[in-house]
């Protein structure tokens, strides 16, 4: 909250008091549209005419024989997340509140956003380390050379679309990997991670391919856990939300599971019932659909009205405090992250 003009940060979430009137705010830039920015002179704002398509691909499974290598890569926690069912109306309603200028959701009592703490707790990803960056080569020659260097085989013309390698080819390659050597298990993990990137962390609107630009970062297996994959995941979500805020956008991509579960943890009046306490916290929401049938029928306009009428205490500042997750054992590698704030 903001007191005397000073923005306070609590529990990793940022909220600023904007002194809202009975309306939320007016949109200042023409390329963006948000029904949350409409006035409430004679009642609640009109529901949005947009209904962005959002699809979530469940991540691939892995062989138990590669668990040691998976832990060494830093992706073991997120690999435990099973099938997730997201809520399209919730995603759409949140996008209507997103402002690209500040990378925050604008609510009647201020602004809030998704933080690195949320990424660490919801996905169990490392948020410290080297930046996930590099040269983006979209050439076919570069793709073939990198795959030949790391796997001794490269996708043919039918196995990739431009710079995107098809999931079907990667899954076939993963099944054919020999796991009786350390090198074979490491190559298996690299393929598994490419699929994880394409289905969850860095997915695009194709839902069929993953850009091979991530592969050079996996070249040295011992360096993989040294990257701040959680930071890259969060940046990708910010970018996806900014693109979805445009008036001409018809579909939203990115790590939407992070968005949904962040809302369920921080805005409990928008959440179904948690299945069972587990880490990473995304695992706690895997079976909500079988327990809360009425929640499935919530519409965009209904959720927008709930957000419009939120009270000042409707946002949970410390959802990861011992009082909130007392039955969940947080692994030491997550607790030791300085910037996590748990």
Predicted regions, residues:
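Structural stabilizers in ordered domains
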Residues: 1-342
């Amino acid at each position: 909250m903001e007191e005397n003009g000073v923005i306070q940060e609590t529990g990793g979430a940022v909220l600023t008091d904007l002194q809202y009137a009975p309306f939320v705010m007016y949109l200042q830039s023409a390329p963006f549209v948000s029904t949350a920015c409409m006035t409430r002179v004679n009642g609640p704002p009109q529901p949005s005419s947009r209904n962005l398509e959002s699809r979530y691909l469940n991540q691939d499974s892995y062989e138990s024989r590669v668990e040691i290598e998976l832990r060494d890569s830093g992706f073991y926690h997120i690999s435990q997340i099973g099938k997730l069912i997201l809520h399209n109306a919730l995603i759409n309603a949140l996008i209507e509140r997103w402002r690209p200028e500040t990378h925050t959701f604008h609510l009647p009592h201020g602004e809030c956003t998704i933080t690195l703490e949320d990424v660490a707790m919801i996905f169990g990803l490392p948020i410290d380390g080297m930046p996930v960056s590099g040269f983006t080569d979209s050439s076919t020659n570069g793709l073939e050379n990198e795959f030949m260097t790391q796997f001794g085989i490269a996708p043919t013309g039918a196995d990739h679309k431009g710079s995107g390698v098809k999931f079907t080819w990667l899954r076939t390659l993963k099944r054919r990997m020999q796991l009786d050597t350390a090198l074979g298990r490491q190559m298996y993990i690299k393929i598994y991670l490419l699929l994880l990137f394409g289905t969850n962390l860095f997915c695009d609107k194709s839902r069929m391919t993953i850009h091979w630009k991530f592969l050079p970062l996996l070249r040295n297996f011992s360096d993989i856990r040294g990257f701040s994959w959680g930071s890259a995941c969060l940046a990708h979500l910010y970018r996806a939300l900014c693109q979805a805020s445009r008036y001409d956008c018809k579909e939203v991509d990115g790590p939407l599971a992070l968005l949904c579960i962040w809302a369920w943890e921080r805005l409990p009046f928008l959440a179904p019932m948690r299945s069972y306490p587990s880490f990473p916290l995304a695992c706690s929401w895997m079976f909500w659909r079988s327990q809360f049938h009425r929640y499935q029928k919530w519409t965009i306009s209904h959720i927008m009205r709930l957000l419009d009428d939120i009270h000042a205490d409707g946002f949970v500042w410390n959802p990861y405090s011992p009082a909130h997750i007392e039955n969940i054992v947080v692994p030491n590698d997550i607790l030791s992250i300085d910037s996590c704030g748990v």
